[in-house]
Design a protein with these regions (language model features):
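UBC/E2-like fold recognition across ubiquitin and ubiquitin-like conjugation systems
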Residues: 1-88, 98-226
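Short, conserved beta-strand/beta-arch hydrophobic-aromatic motifs that form part
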Residues: 95
């Protein structure tokens, strides 16, 4: 994929297309590094598919695959509701026509269930990812946002308190504060053999609240290895 990316003549690209090219190159480079570090090269921790391109052949819509352990739901309807874990999560990224600009932020939406206070679990906006953060500006790179979502999935980063910028899903946030943190469920290892660690009593509801983040290039919507 890097060969395809490098064939573009940057002098012939508009400012927007040059930005799309740069974002693509950074994402692809991140993917290559993750693939090289993976125990199974066919299953890197993050991979991508290009779902849509513009007239210049530059990506305007991606599908990101995360292969990490994360919470995808809870058991039962009454407390204590233990977490249900999954290991493959798919998220779409749509870059609007006015991207990049303050009013043209990328739209991140999970296509698989994710149980996280900053990701909508149900309803008409199901899967929507809230990336508001005081330490990341509106012009944060696509690569940095993809890594931020990886931190979300691992529960290394979350905002469950009912304070600005407010949780995206209040039901999940309440579960985090009242059930998950007291039971240590927000601190789960990626290694299945390692038991969960108890929560820090002094950090309840503040996982940055909890803070401690790629992929495979594609051709014709098929994941390639490099």
């Amino acid at each position: 994929m890097s060969d395809i990316i490098n064939k573009f003549d940057l002098k012939k690209l508009s400012p927007r297309d040059a930005c799309l090219w740069k974002e693509w190159k950074e994402l692809d480079s991140l993917c290559a590094k993750r693939k090289a570090a993976a125990a199974n090269p066919r299953e890197p921790s993050i991979s991508y598919i290009i779902r849509k391109k513009n007239a210049m052949g530059l990506p305007t819509e991606y599908e990101i695959w995360y292969r990490v352990k994360s919470i995808v739901g809870v058991k039962g309807t009454t407390p204590p509701r233990e977490p249900i874990f999954g290991n493959l999560h798919k998220m779409s990224i749509v870059l609007p026509n006015n991207y990049p600009s303050a009013d043209g932020n990328p739209i991140f939406t999970f296509r698989t269930d994710i149980w996280h206070p900053n990701i909508r679990f149900s309803g008409s906006f199901k899967g929507h990812v809230c990336l508001n953060s005081k330490d990341m500006g509106v012009m944060a790179s696509l690569k940095s946002l993809v890594l931020r979502v990886e931190q979300y999935l691992k529960y290394q980063d979350y905002h469950a308190q009912n304070t600005y910028p407010y949780p995206e899903d209040q039901n999940v946030a309440e579960w985090v504060r009242e059930e998950a943190e007291p039971n240590g469920w927000t601190r789960f290892p990626q290694d299945e053999k390692t038991p969960p660690q108890p929560a820090d009593p002094g950090n309840s509801g503040n996982g940055t609240d909890g803070k401690a983040s790629v992929e495979t290039p594609i051709k014709n919507n098929k994941i390639l290895t490099i």
